[in-house]
Curated annotation (Swiss-Prot):
Topology in membrane: Peripheral membrane protein
Stored SMART domains: EFG_C
Major location (coarse): membrane
Taxonomic source organism: Helicobacter hepaticus (strain ATCC 51449 / 3B1)
Residues the entry annotates as binding GTP: D21, H22, G23, K24, S25, T26, N137, K138, I139, D140
Gene (name only): lepA
Enzyme superclass (EC): hydrolase
Domain of life: Bacteria
GO cellular component: plasma membrane
Entry protein name: Elongation factor 4
Job of this protein: Required for accurate and efficient protein synthesis under certain stress conditions. May act as a fidelity factor of the translation reaction, by catalyzing a one-codon backward translocation of tRNAs on improperly translocated ribosomes. Back-translocation proceeds from a post-translocation (POST) complex to a pre-translocation (PRE) complex, thus giving elongation factor G a second chance to translocate the tRNAs correctly. Binds to ribosomes in a GTP-dependent manner.
Signal sequence coordinates: none
Residue ranges of coiled coil: none
Family: Belongs to the TRAFAC class translation factor GTPase superfamily. Classic translation factor GTPase family. LepA subfamily.
Length: 604
């Protein structure tokens, strides 16, 4: 299929902003169906969510794009829809999607109202000066209250909702009005088609047949097949081998991509790293002077060790991580070794959901069995000699006498909750060393709390605890703010006298005793009994702060003695005692995988 260049005034680039589960992917399905982009036979639910794991969890992870045509008032308009993820971990996918649009649909569930993540994404859209159209979805639900939600949007975000769009993505009600409103309200792109080529790469992935592909937004000029282009960050030059328009089922081949359009470019590269997200592509003979601005690359926020259970699968794990990295620019990893777990990788993630998704994809797509250690954040450690060390792995924390001070990263957390759960949340946040910044009532029944919290306190099980203390009604979003000095220590776990490096965690000094106590108690339940007594200890430095003993398994060595002399039995029992002593001195204890997960389960 060939496509013609569309004049800029007939192009609309927009994305959909919504909290998880507010019906964003279903709305995208209805828009695609209404525009006739996909035949009835090809249409599947959540057609934009291509990964199995996205469909199973009902979440969008990778931002997808699609080009739609819609006739309106005698003209055919091209609508480029960019679907964005709604979960807090994937907000970098949102920021890069929004940097290539002129408008955004703000989709809010008619029965639930505005959530914390929605507000965070609206602010990103406002920073990019986008036209925001509020849309109230799921109006067919029995609990729908569109008027309350419209007031909610006005009071929380400040958007005018007098003529707000009400739709049902499930039944298709209101979809035609929505498409017409997109054409009328969202501005056309404002690029200069005669200026030098300037294209922003806002996504890239690896195709087994075509190599590395990049999704670009043409800011100025045009792109055509055979043109020699230059990647601005590296200065390297390539020939454009093929150009496509995005389509949910099959890419549409084209010879040129016009100004203001979105398209897929193939330069015949073997690796995505040469087409980094956020980079600018320009013409090599007549380059643009300034690259496209307004894009922030993703920084890893949480680190964890990932190790193969079968130690000979290390190279396969390396290969698998490299393949995932091709499609996930936020993933970072480097090799590391652990005394307890052997060879593995220290992997950087955007958050806990990202970590879960990556681990699940590694296990599912590459058939690997993995152990993940407890997630940690990056600490700044200032040494007595004046130097500064960044610590990602607790076992790398220098000795106490060499440390001047430790700084830990803080986040600003926004939590929106029904007002009856405020007390529970305040208790949870104060237990997690949170500092209240503000608390505001959005309406009679909903409250927004803003807290500064150490990142360390939210990477374990904060989200689960928040959901359980609010019966699942609270929503949560965070952004990194700064490093602050903390009174922190490393808590080590010793099994049979040896430190298990993969179980070390960095904790606030005031909490070290209760965390150590909880850890040794849960480890006692998990570690299998041995033929000798095993001590499980929690220690800070050289000081043991908690201890539990696992009793040895008893073997009846006197079973073969039938009556007779007591000294014979005594001799056998003494011999057994000696053997156990020797075993205790040299015996190794195999730790089951649950032992490494015990850290995640202890209460903060």
């Amino acid at each position: 299929m060939k496509a013609l260049i569309v004049p800029q005034e007939y192009i609309r680039n927009f994305s959909i902003i919504a909290h998880i589960d507010h019906g964003k992917s279903t709305l995208a399905d209805r828009l695609i169906q209404e525009c006739g982009a996909v035949s009835e036979r090809e249409m599947t639910a959540q057609i934009m969510d291509t990964m199995d794991i996205e469909k199973e969890r009902g979440i969008t992870i990778k931002a997808q794009s699609v080009r739609l045509n819609y006739p309106y008032k005698g003209q055919t308009y091209t609508l480029n829809l960019i679907d964005t993820p709604g979960h807090v971990d994937f907000s970098y996918e949102v920021s890069r999607s929004l940097s290539s649009c002129e408008g955004a649909l703000l989709v809010v569930d008619a029965s639930q109202g505005v959530e914390a993540q929605t507000i965070a994404n609206v602010y990103i859209a406002m920073e990019n000066n986008l036209e925001i159209l509020p849309v109230i979805n799921k109006i067919d639900l029995p609990a729908a209250d569109p008027l309350r939600v419209a007031e909610d949007i006005e009071s929380t975000i400040g958007l005018d909702c007098t003529d707000v769009l009400q739709v049902s993505a499930k039944s298709g009600e209101g979809i035609k009005n929505l498409l017409e409103r997109i054409i009328e309200c969202i501005p056309a792109p404002s690029g200069d088609e005669n200026a030098p080529t300037k294209a922003l790469i806002y996504d890239s992935w690896f195709d087994n047949y075509l190599g590395a592909l990049a999704l670009v937004r043409l800011v100025n000029g045009t792109l055509r097949v055979g043109q020699e282009v230059q990647v601005m960050s590296s200065g390297k030059k390539y020939e454009v081998l093929a150009l496509y328009y995005p389509h949910p089922v099959q890419k549409i081949l084209t010879q040129t991509i016009g100004c203001g359009e979105i398209g897929i470019i193939s330069l015949g590269l073997k690796s995505v790293t040469e087409m980094a997200v956020g980079d600018t592509i320009t013409d090599s003979k007549n380059p643009t002077k300034v690259p496209v601005e307004g894009f922030r690359p993703a920084k890893p926020f949480v680190f964890a060790g990932i190790y193969p259970i079968e130690t000979d699968k290390f190279e396969e794990l390396r290969e698998a991580l490299h393949k995932l990295k091709l499609n996930d620019s936020a993933l970072s990893f480097e090799p590391e070794t652990s005394v307890a777990l052997g060879f593995g990788f220290r992997v950087g993630f955007l958050g806990l959901l990202h970590m879960e998704v990556v681990k699940e994809r590694l296990e599912r797509e590459f058939s690997l069995n993995l152990i993940a250690t407890a997630p940690t954040v990056v600490y700044e450690v200032y040494m007595t000699d004046g130097s500064k060390v960044l610590v990602q792995n607790p076992s790398e924390l220098p000795e106490v006498q060499k440390i001047e001070s430790i700084y830990e990263p803080y986040v600003r957390a926004s939590i929106i909750t029904p007002s009856e759960y405020v007390g529970n949340i305040i208790t949870l946040l104060s237990n997690r060393r949170g500092v209240q910044e503000k608390m505001e009532y959005l309406n009679q029944s909903r409250v927004m709390l803003t807290y500064a919290l150490p990142s360390n306190e939210i990477v374990m099980d904060f989200y689960d605890k928040l959901k359980s203390c609010t019966k699942g009604y609270a929503s949560f979003d965070y952004e990194p703010i700064e490093y602050r000095q903390g009174d922190l220590v490393r808590l080590d776990i010793r099994v049979a006298g040896e430190i298990v490096d993969a179980l070390s965690i960095i904790v606030d000094k005031s909490k070290s005793y209760e965390k150590g106590r909880a850890l040794v108690e849960s480890m006692k339940e998990i570690v299998p009994r041995q033929l000798f007594e095993v001590a499980i200890q929690a220690s800070v430095g050289n000081k043991v702060i908690a201890r539990e003993n696992i009793k040895s398994m008893g073997k009846n060595v006197t079973a073969k003695c039938y009556g007779g002399d007591i000294t014979r039995k005594r001799k056998l029992l003494e011999k057994q005692k000696e053997g156990k002593k020797r075993m205790k001195a040299i015996g190794k204890v195999e730790l089951p995988q649950e032992a490494f997960l015990a850290i995640l389960k202890i209460d903060g």
